[in-house]
Amino acid sequence: MKLRGLYAITDSRLLADGRLLPYVEAALRGGARLLQYRDKSDEDARRLREAEALRDLCLRYGAQLIVNDDLELAARLGVGLHLGQQDGSLSAARALLGPKAIIGATCHGQLELAEQAAADGASYLAFGRFFDSSTKPGAPPASLELLERARARFPQPLVAIGGVTLDNAPELIRRGAAMIAVINALFAAANAAEVEQRARAFGQLFADT
């Protein structure tokens, strides 16, 4: 699948109390192309149930599920994987998941990290944070100019993350982001209908470019 558009990322705090599945389905209905399941807890049984349900939703809507930092779970479900800099070997993940799996890598604001990730077989390169982020307030910043340099340097699609909103996303897309990763500006919503509306608005930004 073409890696372009809205990349929705779950948040266990925002999507507690039964909101996970209806809010995610709303995002998919609104056009999210990739969905990252991000849950850092050690509740393995619950995480497996949720990931299975999310995989089925993604299949229904023609989207792709990406698991954050859990190679074993990604392999078990036959889905993609996102790895941070401390989350294990990308080349080992590629060897296990195979050549067609979507495997993304966090590169922060460093082209050197992206060089290594690209060499190890990353499907996409994620840069950020570009703006103040409530999810990861202490994450190192990345510059908008970095996106332009990365776009000229790498064939892999670029993901922009960190404080992305409908107001600042257009600049990220203009600078070279093929995907915009969104958490709060998508899921911090009053209801599922609002999530769908926000997802459609983010998707329209790509239609306008």
UniProtKB/Swiss-Prot annotation:
Q: Does the keyword section mention Metal-binding?
A: yes
Q: Name one GO biological process term.
A: thiamine biosynthetic process
Cofactor(s) of this protein: Mg(2+)
EC number of the protein: 2.5.1.3
**Which residues participate in 4-amino-2-methyl-5-(diphosphooxymethyl)pyrimidine binding?**
Q36, Y37, R38, D39, K40, N68, T106, K136
Domain of life the protein comes from = Bacteria
Task: Report the CDD domains cross-referenced here.
Answer: TMP_TenI
Q: What does this protein do?
A: Condenses 4-methyl-5-(beta-hydroxyethyl)thiazole monophosphate (THZ-P) and 2-methyl-4-amino-5-hydroxymethyl pyrimidine pyrophosphate (HMP-PP) to form thiamine monophosphate (TMP).
Q: Which family does it belong to?
A: Belongs to the thiamine-phosphate synthase family.
What's this protein's name?
Thiamine-phosphate synthase
Q: Which organism is it from?
A: Azotobacter vinelandii (strain DJ / ATCC BAA-1303)
Q: Taxonomy-wise, where does this protein's organism fall, top ranks first?
A: Bacteria, Pseudomonadati, Pseudomonadota, Gammaproteobacteria, Pseudomonadales
